[in-house]
Curated annotation (Swiss-Prot):
It catalyses: a ubiquinone + NADH + 5 H(+)(in) = a ubiquinol + NAD(+) + 4 H(+)(out). Its EC number is 7.1.1.2. GO terms for molecular function: NADH dehydrogenase (ubiquinone) activity. This is NADH-ubiquinone oxidoreductase chain 1. Belongs to the complex I subunit 1 family. HAMAP family: NDH1_NuoH. GO terms for cellular component: mitochondrial inner membrane; respiratory chain complex I. It is found in: Mitochondrion inner membrane. Its main location: mitochondrion. Keywords: Electron transport, Membrane, Mitochondrion, Mitochondrion inner membrane, NAD, Respiratory chain, Translocase, Transmembrane, Transmembrane helix, Transport, Ubiquinone. GO terms for biological process: aerobic respiration; mitochondrial electron transport, NADH to ubiquinone. It comes from Candida albicans (strain SC5314 / ATCC MYA-2876) (Yeast). Pfam families: NADHdh. The chain crosses the membrane at residues 3-23, 37-57, 69-89, 103-123, 141-161, 173-193, 207-227, 247-267, 282-302.
Length: 317
């Protein structure tokens, strides 16, 4: 039964990715004062199906000196990692594929495996552009995983549980995004960098690295990387909605997640690319010192609050 639920979830995520790509192209079209996709289906809504058909019907071109096994396996690692993260997301009360008391730890462990897909893709292609792109990607992803992990640990410290489902109940009185607004903003910036989306798309900067670690990929194996990127965007948008906006059930959670997913598109259309050294400095010189300072301040504040409550409750100590 659990395998059927996993299959339904995977297909639902892939369908959502298809519509997200259409929404992105339409939104970018409006923001750049052009029409965007409008020929395939009503209002261009079936453009994703046309794109998928075009890519899947093309020939898979494998570089002569590439390590063929790793070249084919690496996009699968990225996609499976991106899809398995969804198994701990509570879509409604009791509707979770794997409702674990260690949900956040599992999420961090599974998502970190996706870095290996990117690294191996760049190395196996035997191309300097791919290799440079994968090195950049690995450094960027590892750096910003530290940011996301630290913020999640701070939320665990405040919430007192690692079960993702519990955070919907905990935030019924007040969303974490209100008292922890600076952390929520840092978390969102970290999510954009973790997905290597503009303005942090130095991994596949067209003017420098063609398509980064995906330069030598074509047809269906390129589609796997494409799907993993957009599945990660939707997952991190949903996780942000649960952590800082109280999550929700069904359509409410979907609306909150779509709000964050739209922000990714908005940022792409608005901001220019950040220079790579400034991106890494932003993580190590600004975000991490702030977060480590918060990691000291938040427990001290919680213990002080507990002491005040104990001291002034009827009967005192």
């Amino acid at each position: 039964m659990q395998y059927i639920e996993l299959l339904i979830m995977f297909l639902s995520v892939l369908l959502a990715v298809a519509f997200l790509t259409v929404a992105e192209r339409k939104t970018l079209g409006y923001m750049q004062r052009r029409v965007g996709p409008n020929a395939v289906g009503y209002y261009g809504i079936l453009m994703a199906i046309a794109d998928a058909a075009k890519l899947l019907l093309k020939e898979i071109v494998v570089p002569t000196h590439a390590d063929k096994l790793i070249l084919f396996v690496s996009p699968m690692i990225s996609l499976i990692s991106a899809l398995l993260c969804w198994s701990v997301i509570p879509f409604a009360p009791g509707v979770t594929i794997y409702d674990s008391n260690y949900g956040f730890i599992l999420t961090l462990a599974i998502s970190s495996v996706g870095v290996f897909g990117t690294l191996l893709a760049g190395w196996s292609a035997n191309s300097k552009y791919s290799l440079l792109g994968s090195i950049r990607s690995t450094a960027q992803l590892i750096s910003y995983e530290l940011v996301l992990t630290t913020i999640i640990l701070l939320c665990i410290l405040i919430g007192g549980t690692m079960n993702v489902s519990k955070y919907i109940e905990i935030q019924q009185a007040i969303w974490y995004g209100i008292p922890l607004l600076p952390l929520a903003i840092i978390f969102f910036i970290g999510c954009v960098a973790e997905c290597a989306r503009p303005p942090f798309d130095n991994v596949e900067a067209e003017s420098e690295l063609v398509s980064g670690h995906m330069t030598e990929y074509s047809s269906s194996i390129f589609v796997l990387f494409f799907l993993s990127e957009y599945a990660s965007i939707l997952f991190l948008s949903t996780l942000t909605a649960i952590l800082f906006m109280g999550g929700g059930t069904g359509i409410i959670l979907g609306l909150k997640a779509n709000l964050f997913a739209f922000t990714y598109i908005w940022v792409r259309a608005t901001l220019p690319r950040v220079r790579y050294d400034k991106l890494i400095n932003l993580c190590w010189m600004i975000f991490l010192p702030i977060l480590f300072g918060s990691a000291i301040a938040v427990p001290a504040y919680l213990y002080a609050l507990d002491a005040i409550i104990i001291l002034y409750r009827p009967g005192g100590l």
